[in-house]
Amino acid sequence: MARTTAINRYRNIGICAHVDAGKTTTTERILFYTGLSHKMGEVHDGAATTDWMVQEQERGITITSAAVTTFWKGSRGQYDNYRVNVIDTPGHVDFTIEVERSLRVLDGAVVVFCGTSGVEPQSETVWRQANKYGVPRVVYVNKMDRAGANFLRVVGQIKNRLGHTPVPVQLAIGAEDNFEGQVDLIKMKAIYWNDDDKGTTYREEEIPADMLDLANEWRSNMVEAAAEANEELMNKYLEEGDLTVEEIKAGLRARTLASEIVPAVCGSSFKNKGVPLVLDAVIDFLPAPTEIPAIKGIHPDLIEKPKDELVEADYDERHADDAEPFSALAFKIATDPFVGTLTFVRVYSGFLSSGDSVINSVKGKKERVGRMVQMHANQREEIKEVRAGDIAALIGMKDVTTGDTLCDLDKQIILERMDFPEPVISVAVEPKTKQDQEKMGIALGKLAQEDPSFRVKTDEETGQTIISGMGELHLDILVDRMKREFNVEANIGKPQVSYREKISKSNVEIEGKFVRQSGGRGQFGHCWIRFSEPDVDANGNITEGLVFTNEVVGGVVPKEYIPAIQKGIEEQMKNGVVAGYPLIGLKATVFDGSYHDVDSNEMAFKVAASMATKQLAQKGGGVVLEPIMKVEVVTPEDYMGDVMGDLNRRRGLIQGMDDSVSGKVIRAEVPLGEMFGYATDVRSMSQGRASYSMEFSKYAEAPSNIVEALVKKQG
């Protein structure tokens, strides 16, 4: 079957925003307008169509949220049919992982801001993540009908607070109750929306006389920004003082794809004024899969090689081309009560038909692809194949987790994995009844498969099941989902902080010796190891894991025992050296030792290395680290003193303060151990008017009274 939409007419986009910018309404409107332009005849005969709104009401948790395929011909039918895959992203910081994983598979993003609140603390987090993945963006300033809305003020905030260059391609006509439409700066026309068809169509008129000067000023800014795309456009602009509509769009597009500028549009999704033009901006300014850099990957044989040791020759590339070997990234796993496990994948190269086999190159397991579906604005469609650039859900994959690569059996590759943060908070969960016991195991397994920032383990000493995640809200929602989706009732223990340890000295030389020789075959392992504290970057982040080097010369320790020494250090790192918490990072160099022809073996050297590592508590200056959270509280000014006093009592360090529409924004770094129950406390302090967000910042040394309590607890 041939491709129905040319790949240069694909757009894989995400709608990103913080909690109250009106993202859900905007996404719903996109589905509404694209659903209208999607001709039913294009759906393959016999496709199972179900109204997605009914499904959402049944579920509560949507499967449409992962990825929806829509079609768009332009607000005036000015384009060939474009295929727009919309990936939804949550706005809450406990779910930063969700945003990260969707940005990883997007080619472009629409970032929604509220016309009144503008740039809020959480919008900065989303923006930073989009920078990390180099995602080209279009800005949509929504809620222009709200009191205090001001498009150009928000544009100024994006420039000053986010450090990016926004280029308005529209201006708002009126604001608040009098918001009527937009000035299209590219065509220099005023746009007014028709209420009788819910803003599907609009009429173009001349720009109101009182706005002409402002429109001319912003248009010349925009044309100048477009002209800076290349020399040819710049020369024409300098000679003629203007560019054609096509040239303006081409110039802005080139600079948007290079992440030099972000085109900005405005509107009111709720009042049906402007969303079709947001979709036009997606087509005009955001990239097709062929316009983003080829995705890189490594061969499965190199999976154990540390990332910083990989050289250019180790990498392979996959281009957005049907003729290349198949490769895809699983970016979300969802459990659907009707069809079982849905694995959402982004196809980067090649094509795949249902019934084909692929290999999960991360786990080395072969999987047969049964059914495949795509979500549309108003139906779920069973499809027979996927091609480069597509986003679809595979049904019935057995052993795939988020971030795994699926690829061609003969041309294997592991695409760059997503970085998943380590959980910072843990709680014990216990099933309420015997019947819940087994169900809980299955439920937790499924939830962990869906969400890589959620971990499940059994405490060896107490036998309790411990779940870990990114914050209290994260774990609350997972426990709630266990109850709602899997019918499992569980009791939750008190939250526990994930402490870590490290050493504070460098170049500490320690001897590890394990000798058992009492007749017959004995044990003999002897090594000298030089330990140093891990490196720390400019932002205070510690290099995690073991950096191990071998400087043994002359064969005093045979080569085959070196991996055992490394393993011994790693195993002891998991158990810690001060209070039983894992060592976050460590540098170790084995440089000397001795062996016995008969009695030496791998086990003996492993034990010797482990014994040497244990001595770091005294000799290496072992310290306990606690997770420090970046906290932002938005509070009315009247409660500012109380909020700041409370943060100080929680050992918080105030980093700074800003003004926002809703009051003062207090930025602080606070140890996680002091933040339990903060949601309730901050509400009661401010009579329910303050709100806060919190994300992991770094690990830092814990004060001695806390360390003493932890050591005592370990007994």
From Swiss-Prot:
It comes from the Bacteria. GO terms for cellular component: cytoplasm. Residues 8-290 form the tr-type G domain. The keyword Mitochondrion does not apply. Its main location: cytoplasm. GTP binds at residues 17-24, 88-92, 142-145. Keywords: Cytoplasm, Elongation factor, GTP-binding, Nucleotide-binding, Protein biosynthesis. GO terms for biological process: ribosome disassembly. Transmembrane segments: none annotated. One of its GO terms (molecular function) is GTPase activity. It holds the Pfam family EFG_IV. The keyword Nucleotide-binding applies. It is found in: Cytoplasm. Catalyzes the GTP-dependent ribosomal translocation step during translation elongation. During this step, the ribosome changes from the pre-translocational (PRE) to the post-translocational (POST) state as the newly formed A-site-bound peptidyl-tRNA and P-site-bound deacylated tRNA move to the P and E sites, respectively. Catalyzes the coordinated movement of the two tRNA molecules, the mRNA and conformational changes in the ribosome. Belongs to the TRAFAC class translation factor GTPase superfamily. Classic translation factor GTPase family. EF-G/EF-2 subfamily. This is Elongation factor G.
